[in-house]
Amino acid sequence: MAGNRSIITLECKTCKERNYTTTKNKKKTQDKLTLSKYCPRCRKHVEHKETK
């Protein structure tokens, strides 16, 4: 049986580079996920938004 969690990628809002992958429960959080993570290209903490 497959679970409700799916793998998503997080994209930097400033440079648009896809730096991180994580899992998300689609039943509980249906809106797009945004997290503050470190971007090695920007060299600072920036908001990362969920992409496919």
From Swiss-Prot:
Q: Name one GO cellular component term.
A: ribosome
Which GO molecular function terms does the record list?
A: structural constituent of ribosome
UniProt key word Ribosomal protein: yes
Family under the similarity heading: Belongs to the bacterial ribosomal protein bL33 family.
Gene Ontology biological process terms in this record:
translation
Q: Which InterPro entries match?
A: Ribosomal_bL33, Ribosomal_bL33_CS, Ribosomal_bL33_sf, Ribosomal_zn-bd
Please list the coiled coil stretches: none
Highest classification ranks of the organism: Bacteria, Pseudomonadati, Myxococcota, Myxococcia, Myxococcales
One short Pfam name that applies is Ribosomal_L33
User: What is the name listed in the Swiss-Prot or TrEMBL entry for this protein?
Assistant: Large ribosomal subunit protein bL33
Q: Which UniProt keywords apply?
A: Ribonucleoprotein, Ribosomal protein
